[in-house]
């Protein structure tokens, strides 16, 4: 395992794995792991990234110093936007770094 993955703490929901760790910046950074195996079309992968990014932008304070990585579970594709939004906002409120 890499040094970076050892630093990250993990939370999971029904539809996502969320890895997070503090950073030394005055803002948060977001990354995504959406494999081509799970979603073949780049258009759909980008849509997923945009929607999650928007949920995070609304939910988090801009000056929060944290790196967040979202990994999708297969169940993500069977869920609706409201469920995913609720999952993400609840998990982000638990993180509270």
Residue ranges and their predicted role:
Residues 5-97:
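Positively charged, solvent-exposed patches that mediate nucleic-acid binding
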């Amino acid at each position: 395992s890499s040094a970076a993955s050892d630093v990250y703490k993990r939370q999971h929901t029904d539809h996502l794995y969320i890895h997070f760790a503090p950073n030394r910046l005055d803002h948060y950074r977001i990354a995504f792991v959406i494999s081509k195996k799970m979603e073949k079309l780049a258009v759909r992968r980008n849509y997923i990234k945009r929607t999650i990014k928007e949920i995070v932008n609304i939910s988090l304070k801009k000056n929060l110093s944290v790196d967040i990585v979202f990994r999708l579970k297969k169940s993500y594709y069977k869920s609706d936007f409201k469920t995913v939004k609720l999952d993400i906002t609840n998990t982000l409120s638990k993180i509270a770094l």
